[in-house]
Amino acid sequence: MAKVIGIDLGTTNSCVAIMDGAQPRVIENSEGARTTPSIVGFTDSERLVGQPAKRQAVTNPSNTVFAVKRLIGRRVGDAEVEKDKKLVPYAIVNGGNGDAWVEVRGEKYSPSQISAFILQKMKETAEAYLGESVTQAVITVPAYFNDAQRQATKDAGKIAGLEVLRIINEPTAAALAYGLDKKDTKTIAVYDLGGGTFDITILEIDDGLFEVKSTNGDTFLGGEDFDMRIVNYLADEFKKEHGVDLTLDKMALQRLKEAAEKAKIELSSSQQTEINQPFISMDRNTGQPLHMVMKLTRAKLESLVADLIKKSLKPCEAALKDAGVSKSDIDEVVLVGGMTRMPRVVEEVTKFFGKEPHKGVNPDEVVALGAAIQAGVLQGDVKDVVLLDVTPLSLGIETLGGVFTRLIDRNTTIPTKKSQVFSTAEDNQNAVTIRVFQGEREMAADNKMLGQFNLEDIPPAPRGMPQIEVTFDIDANGIVSVSAKDKGTGKSQNITIQASGGLSDEDIEKMVRDAEANAEADKKRRELVETKNQGESLLHSTRKSIEEHGDKVDPSTVEAIELAMGALEESLKTEDAGKIKGGIQNLTEAAMRLGEAIYKASQSETGAAPDEDGPRSVDDDIVDADFEDLGENKRK
């Protein structure tokens, strides 16, 4: 039975894990790392994912996409998207349906597509380790993701060639990994501050039962925001000193971002770090190069990001209130996400909950481990684990006057189904439009619109007379279906909510085909590189053989080999793998003649060496005598 893998699709880094016996295990990628940067780079000839993409980001900033998770399921015009446009070096554009897409090298990609490239890398990592094909996965999302973001994540899995068996909330996955072997009853808080999102989840764990009591968060608060505070500080200081605005230079901005991330990490274990960026710009008056050499202290960093840390505590208050528990009722605080390595974050969380956080989990890996456990549960490999999750936001419809009427309140355990009867607003109204929203505001327009559909052919009747039953159904992935039924006629209409933009089935199928075509192109590219390496290696070894033994063979043989070498060198300048293979074959055959000639020359020298005392037969040579002596010695 094929393995189901667990994937933590992160803003900054991603991670893949499987169940190895009774325990989850993180799989190392092809570079030997346990996490993979969630970065995709596009060069002239290929697409790079992970560390190779990160390495070339400074020299190729406009074509290197990072933190795309912050765009997934979002619309152009959203405040978060407009903010991101000013911060990232790549282009964020309208996908044609109002969704935020990215544009690289003149081609548009949806955030789901970019995420799919990262998921493909995770899939390949697992396949290389397992030695078999992987087709099914459990993928994690921030607990506070809305329906559009969850659907877009599921689409990303499909584009990557994965059947997504379950979308699971990141804090819930972390709780699974934390509590898998724990038998006692505990109420825990999972504080998850990652690269781009923040979640807080309150759970009750009782011998294999994981019940989420409440969840809250901010899908636009994370390490990327901390990095940008440092970037802006460095750019401001540099501008004060040199009068040059580095934020206008995409390459300099990318260098600053990398330096900021490095400085932030270093300041988690030291009090001060030096940011050294030589030749980062040029003096406009003198033409002399400008260098950035600046010291950053932990205290200064903490002052730059103090409000961001405080911002994470408001959802904590809301989650405790929704769960109906006090801070003193929390038995354990589990920290998740790379940002929880920052000492000031730990201090603030400790102060808020009044207890030291649990330090027994790896914040970068625990979510993927939890996803693998959930995969094991779905596959039947993990027994006695029951997971009860919740919907993070209230769901409802727009009613008369633009009011948001809730059908399902936030923090309702899922899967769930709820119905409510509505009526018409006007006499003889023959159709109603059901507009579905998700959020906590009282007016529908202030919430996130998930979609709309019409129920038509309602028999003429006075207003308030027809009975229209609206039913909301949320599955275990947190994805919503809505139906409306005229109880008088029995006529019904239903939809699985797709964001008002979103990807259609046709879009997804096209992207799946593109991904498959790209996989084939990537395979050919890898084959070409390997063939070129083989050709270079053969040229080197043949050249060395000619230098050492060329005088032992006739000139015509050497000439034939040199001709074959020249032809191979020319073919290596092309991108034609078939031509290169032909060149390798020809040179291999020519080089074999060199080997034969060297061998014959060697035999001739050994067998026909003259003796000063007269001719001597081969039988008189000492080889036989030596052999006999060795035999005697062995018998002794």
Swiss-Prot record:
<keyword id="KW-0143">Chaperone</keyword>
<keyword id="KW-0597">Phosphoprotein</keyword>
<dbReference type="InterPro" id="IPR029048">
    <property type="entry name" value="HSP70_C_sf"/>
</dbReference>
<dbReference type="InterPro" id="IPR018181">
    <property type="entry name" value="Heat_shock_70_CS"/>
</dbReference>
<dbReference type="InterPro" id="IPR043129">
    <property type="entry name" value="ATPase_NBD"/>
</dbReference>
<keyword id="KW-0067">ATP-binding</keyword>
<dbReference type="GO" id="GO:0140662">
    <property type="term" value="F:ATP-dependent protein folding chaperone"/>
</dbReference>
<keyword id="KW-0346">Stress response</keyword>
<dbReference type="GO" id="GO:0005524">
    <property type="term" value="F:ATP binding"/>
</dbReference>
<comment type="similarity">
    <text>Belongs to the heat shock protein 70 family.</text>
</comment>
<feature type="modified residue" description="Phosphothreonine; by autocatalysis">
    <location>
        <position position="197"/>
    </location>
</feature>
<keyword id="KW-0547">Nucleotide-binding</keyword>
<protein>
    <recommendedName>
        <fullName>Chaperone protein DnaK</fullName>
    </recommendedName>
</protein>
<dbReference type="InterPro" id="IPR012725">
    <property type="entry name" value="Chaperone_DnaK"/>
</dbReference>
<dbReference type="Pfam" id="PF00012">
    <property type="entry name" value="HSP70"/>
</dbReference>
<dbReference type="InterPro" id="IPR013126">
    <property type="entry name" value="Hsp_70_fam"/>
</dbReference>
<comment type="function">
    <text>Acts as a chaperone.</text>
</comment>
<feature type="compositionally biased region" description="Acidic residues">
    <location>
        <begin position="620"/>
        <end position="630"/>
    </location>
</feature>
<dbReference type="GO" id="GO:0051082">
    <property type="term" value="F:unfolded protein binding"/>
</dbReference>
<dbReference type="InterPro" id="IPR029047">
    <property type="entry name" value="HSP70_peptide-bd_sf"/>
</dbReference>
<feature type="region of interest" description="Disordered">
    <location>
        <begin position="601"/>
        <end position="636"/>
    </location>
</feature>
